[in-house]
Curated annotation (Swiss-Prot):
Any one Pfam family match given in the protein's UniProt record, by short name: SeqA
Family: Belongs to the SeqA family.
The protein's name: Negative modulator of initiation of replication
InterPro entries (UniProt xref): Arc_rbn_hlx_hlx (IPR013321), Ribbon_hlx_hlx (IPR010985), SeqA (IPR005621), SeqA_DNA-bd_C (IPR026577), SeqA_DNA-bd_C_sf (IPR036835), SeqA_N (IPR033761)
Source organism: Psychromonas ingrahamii (strain DSM 17664 / CCUG 51855 / 37)
Biased composition (Polar residues): 43-54
Assembly mode: Homodimer. Polymerizes to form helical filaments.
Length: 207
């Protein structure tokens, strides 16, 4: 896969043609151009938010890299419309048909994190700073920091955790964790953000 730069209006056009949660730029373009589908293992979910003042994020060179994505020159996040299931908070997301029928745990995990971010951005950022493993951050805004390691063995292990952009946010999160670890991440985030206990308890049922 290759990194490319596209102008803001083209990027917004791609975003406007997302038909399914987690759909990648390649999948969207293949559909729009009526091209045959490629292997899903080579796809990276589309990222819909980039901080204009930040330098462009370089992709990590790895034969199974999951970090390469289409990067726009400028994107005004205020002009991005959230998919309907993500726009009304966690309680509404749990009850939405899209969430209930989603069979892939990682997709539910990402939907929850995106919804939590837009429900309270400041609280989400604070919670992200506190939600960590023993030696690793689980999520953050700086992919290079997430990939930082004291040894090559540690770095290779973390690359295998497949950090991915949380859709419609500037955050990345590890995704190649088991369901129990994903529940822990969501539970810690929700507790730090002050969600009511009954909603936090639903994580065990919903993921």
């Amino acid at each position: 896969m290759k990194n490319i730069e596209i102008e803001d209006d083209l990027y917004k056009y791609i975003l406007a043609n997302i038909e399914a949660f987690g759909e990648t730029p390649s999948q969207i373009l293949r559909r729009l151009l009526s091209l045959p589908n490629a292997s899903p293992d080579n796809a990276t979910p589309i990222t819909s938010s980039v901080t204009p003042s930040a330098p462009r994020q370089e992709a990590v060179n790895d034969e199974s890299s999951v970090f390469e994505a289409v990067t726009p020159k400028v994107l005004d996040r205020a002009n991005i419309s959230l998919p309907e299931p993500l726009a009304h908070g966690v309680n509404a997301l749990f009850d939405s048909e899209v969430f209930k029928t989603e069979a892939v745990v990682t997709n539910k995990f990402m939907m929850l994190l995106a919804t939590m971010y837009y429900e309270n951005k400041n609280a989400f950022e604070d919670a992200a700073d506190k939600t960590k493993g023993r030696t690793r951050d689980y999520l953050g805004q700086n992919l290079n920091a997430l990939l930082a390691a004291d040894s090559e063995e540690e770095q290779n292990f973390f690359k295998a955790s497949k950090p991915r952009n949380i859709p419609h946010t500037p955050f990345w999160v590890i995704t190649n964790a088991n369901t129990g670890r994903k529940r822990i991440i969501i539970t810690q985030m929700m507790a730090s953000m002050g969600y009511p206990h009954y909603l936090i308890e639903r994580i065990k049922e919903e993921i």
